[in-house]
A protein has these predicted regions:
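Conserved small/polar residues in nucleotide/adenosyl-binding loops
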Residues: 1-9, 219-220
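Conserved acidic residues
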Residues: 3, 72, 204
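ATP/NTP phosphate-donor binding region
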Residues: 10-77
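Short glycine-/acidic-enriched loop or helix-start segments at secondary-structure transitions
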Residues: 31, 85-87, 111-112, 217-218
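Hydrophobic packing residues within well-ordered alpha-helices of enzyme cores
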Residues: 38, 60, 86, 110-111, ...
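Catalytic core of DAGKc-family lipid kinases
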Residues: 45, 52, 92-208
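Short Gly/Thr/Asp-enriched flexible loops that form oxyanion-binding sites at enzyme active sites
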Residues: 82-93
């Protein structure tokens, strides 16, 4: 009967190990208000959950490289940068593990492009579900990006804008930092190859994006 089906599903799910990586400071630390409910949802979905809070830039990458192979699924929560770090770790370790994303940053443009709910519990429900889909990613040197890679004007804004300002002002914090860079605008001589075509010119800005909208959270080319 139906009860036996649920029992069998539960037995299968209990063998699944999940690594939950999140940035505790992203988006005004809103993850803290939902953490218990999110973990409870993961456990009820049949996962044995390990929680890790990122402590510094690239910490999520290091965690995935060192321990990712021991898990059946990885879920991350934070801004677009946190997701980039997790994907970089998966690529460096050559792991093929399903990942889930619970957006909690100041912009979350990439999540919006994928139609991931803004409400954290709804996003968590999708992250532990069984509906999977492939997603394009970009790579250069040893870095991987799922959102955007860019060079030139304003590309340092994301790194120079403090987490405290982002939590207080959101998008406006990026604008405030960007205005400071208008005094010094360098250009770059570039050769671009695409679809069998080549062109060269001087550029003050360039980007490759995987999103339908762009704020200012960059990976540097």
């Amino acid at each position: 009967g139906l009860g036996d089906v649920y029992k069998r599903q539960g037995e299968l799910r209990m063998s699944q190990k999940l690594l939950f990586i999140f940035n505790p400071h992203a988006g005004k630390g809103q993850i803290k208000n939902h953490l218990v409910d999110i973990v409870d949802m993961m456990v009820k979905a049949g996962f044995d959950v390990t929680i890790y809070t990122t402590q510094a830039q690239a910490d999520a990458t290091r965690k995935v490289v060192e321990e990712g192979a021991g898990y059946d699924r990885i879920v991350c929560s934070g801004g677009d940068g946190t997701l980039d770090e997790v994907m970089t770790g998966l690529m460096q370790a050559k792991l093929h593990i399903p990942i889930g994303y619970i957006p909690a940053g100041s912009t979350n443009d990439f999540a919006n492009s994928l139609g991931i709910p803004k409400e954290m519990l709804k996003a968590a429900e999708r992250a532990v579900g069984q509906n999977r889909f492939p997603c394009d990613i970009g790579d250069f040197n040893s870095d991987t990006f799922v959102y955007i890679a860019a060079f030139g004007l304003f590309t340092e804004v994301s790194y120079k804008t403090s987490q405290q300002l982002k939590n207080i002002f959101g998008h406006v914090a990026y604008i405030m930092e960007g205005v400071k860079q208008l005094r010094d605008i360098p250009s770059f001589r570039m050769q671009v190859e695409y679809d069998g075509k080549v062109f060269q010119d001087e550029f003050i800005y360039g980007m490759v994006t995987n999103s339908v909208s762009v704020a200012v959270s960059y990976t540097h080319l």
